[in-house]
Every structure is written in C-alpha cells, then in structure tokens.
C-alpha cells in the first residue's frame, strides 16, 4: 500500500533529506540511483519499456532493432511504436541486452552496483518482481547531459519542471511517462 506523500515527507526529512516540493523526492531518488549504478545521470520514468521508447525517440532511430526472441512482450511493441522495425535473434541473455545497433540497453531484470556501461542509455525496471520492488517504475541511466535534459522534459508531457507552468515554452511534445513522487519515495525508503 502506498502512503500519501504528506505522510512520507516527514520520514524522508528524518533521514536528512530536504524536501521543499514533492518533485524534490524524485530528484533525490534519481541522484541516489545514478551514484549506485555508476552513471552521471538518472532519469526516472513510469516503467523500463517507456524508458527505452524515450531513448529510441531521443536518438531519432528509425531502422531495424534486433532483440532476443525471448524478451518481454512489451519490448517489440515499444520498438514498433517508436517507428522502428523489429528483428528477433535466438540468443540467450541474462539480466541485460542491447537493442542492436543502438546504444540502448534493456536491463529490466538487472540492478546492481556499478552496472552502468559508459556511453549507453541503460534502462531498468522497478516492477514488484524486480530487484528494487517499488511496484511500478523505471530508470534511464546515461552519461549524456543533453539526453538527460531531453528525457526530463519528454517524460513529463514536454514540461520543464524547473520553470513555472505559465512561463514554460513547451519546446517539445512529450509523453506522460514520469515517475510520481510517491513511487520515488517508496524507492528511497526501500533502497
């Protein structure tokens, strides 16, 4: 059961976190996990599949994407929705695989310290059957600052959360793929 955000903030503040806005919780969670994974940046999303979708859209990749034939059903669907073609290959994998030929990695079942591959866009899942069991959620790890900035806006309907809504210029059309502060708080408390 998820606690209301108002009841979670005091728990986080007791642990030394400074919370001025509920979205600060998301930022804290992202920074903690970037450090754990060994990447410069982490961008939380609502699930791993949507994280990979955002990566393909950011890369503007429209070719053929090769993935293992024994992947989760949402992955080939996501590739098609991103404007690419799917090619399956019969290979065994464990924890992590590349969406070839892109630098995007599906690490839905892997979440280990120092796991980040430099130069990659590495996505993980926080489904209740995964290692960090938030219930729903995912993360994109990257060392690319431009990508990081784009992902943060694209995941939240094209909005820049650091700018008041009435002042935001909405320079891109985004998607509703963000992690809620409640999910991030659960992740901090479980991690």
Pin down the residues of each PLM region.
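PLP-dependent aminotransferase-like
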Residues: 57-114
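Alpha-helical elements of the RecA-like P-loop NTPase motor core of helicases
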Residues: 53, 76-77, 149, 185
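Active-site region of PLP-dependent enzymes
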Residues: 111, 121-191
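Conserved SAM-binding loop
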Residues: 44, 67-68, 140
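Conserved PLP-binding active-site segment in aminotransferase class I/II-type PLP enzymes
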Residues: 1-61, 82, 177-191
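Short active-site oxyanion
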Residues: 40-42, 63-64, 102, 136-137
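Short alpha-helical
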Residues: 28, 50, 73-74, 146
């Amino acid at each position: 059961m998820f606690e209301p955000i108002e009841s979670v903030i005091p728990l986080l503040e007791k642990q030394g976190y400074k919370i001025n806005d509920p979205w600060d919780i998301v930022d804290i969670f992202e920074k903690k996990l970037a450090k754990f994974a060994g990447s410069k940046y982490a961008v939380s999303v609502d699930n791993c599949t949507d994280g990979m979708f955002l990566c393909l859209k950011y890369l503007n990749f429209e070719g053929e994407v090769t993935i293992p034939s024994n992947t989760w059903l949402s992955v080939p669907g996501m590739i098609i929705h991103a404007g690419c073609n799917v090619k399956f290959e019969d290979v065994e994998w464990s924890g992590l695989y590349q969406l070839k030929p892109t630098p995007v990695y599906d690490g839905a079942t892997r979440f280990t310290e120092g796991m980040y591959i430099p130069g990659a866009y590495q996505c993980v899942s926080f489904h209740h059957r995964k290692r960090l069991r938030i219930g729903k959620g995912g993360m994109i790890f990257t060392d690319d600052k431009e990508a990081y900035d784009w992902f943060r806006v694209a995941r939240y309907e094209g909005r820049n959360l650091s700018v008041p809504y009435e002042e935001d210029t909405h320079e891109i059309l985004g998607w509703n793929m963000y992690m809620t502060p409640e999910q991030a708080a659960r992740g901090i408390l479980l991690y």
